[in-house]
């Protein structure tokens, strides 16, 4: 169509993305499909077309009237990753490392892992280099991440450990030491 200019975002293209998502949502709600898989979307174009949500994930959550925690879950073979933050500028990430957000991510990892038949081994990544070096290079690990892990383990008995330095955590995870990385 004339409305499409290769390499440029537009409201027309965003409306096409939204129409595809809406069709998939309708089919899922009608029980005609059991899941939705889609390729890359352009959030900017979708916003030009009138989407008022931060991401397609929030769009889905609203469409399905979801009240429980949700986020993008990525799978690679037997390894799952769950995000504590998502689709935010790096300058906002530290402020989003809260007990509530971290608990939601851990809970989602546990529930999703269990639904796949696992008793998941969950590893929580640090935010700062070298796990913050005991507060010398960032306090998120000391003030939020470690205490939250300890509370969750005490309250639930789930197999959650960390924080681990993010630069080396995936070596262990890909070797099979963990099922979920938060």
Model-inferred region functions:
Residues 1-56, 100-181:
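Contiguous, glycine/small-aliphatic-enriched amphipathic segments in soluble metabolic enzymes
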Residues 1-6, 80-89:
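Short, basic/glycine-rich phosphate-binding loops at helix/coil junctions
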Residues 46-52, 76, 80, 89, ...:
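Helix-enriched interaction subdomains in cytosolic or periplasmic regions
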Residues 48-76:
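Short, acidic/small-residue loops that bind anionic groups at enzyme active sites
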Residues 58-62, 66-68, 88-112:
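Active-site glycine-rich loop that binds ribose-phosphate moieties when present
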Residues 70-72, 81, 181:
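Conserved beta-strand scaffold positions in the cores of enzyme catalytic domains, especially
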Residues 74-82, 86, 122-126:
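Mobile beta-alpha loop/short-helix "lid" or hinge segments that flank ligand
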């Amino acid at each position: 169509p004339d409305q499409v200019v290769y390499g440029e975002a537009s409201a027309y293209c965003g409306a096409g993305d939204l129409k595809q998502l809406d069709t998939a949502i309708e089919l899922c709600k009608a029980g005609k499909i059991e899941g939705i898989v889609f390729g890359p979307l352009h959030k900017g174009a979708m916003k030009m077309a009138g989407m008022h949500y931060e991401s397609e994930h929030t769009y889905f959550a609203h469409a399905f009237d979801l009240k429980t925690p949700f986020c993008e879950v990525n799978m690679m073979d037997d390894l799952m990753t769950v995000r504590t933050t998502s689709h935010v500028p790096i300058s906002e990430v530290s402020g989003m490392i809260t007990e509530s957000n971290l608990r939601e991510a851990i809970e989602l990892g546990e529930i999703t892992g269990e639904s796949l038949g696992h008793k998941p081994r969950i590893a929580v990544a640090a935010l700062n280099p070298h796990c913050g070096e005991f507060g010398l290079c960032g306090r998120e690990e000391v003030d939020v991440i470690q205490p939250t892990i300890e509370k969750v383990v005490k309250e639930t008995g789930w197999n959650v450990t960390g924080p681990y330095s993010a630069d080396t955590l995936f070596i262990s995870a890909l070797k099979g030491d963990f099922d979920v990385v938060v």
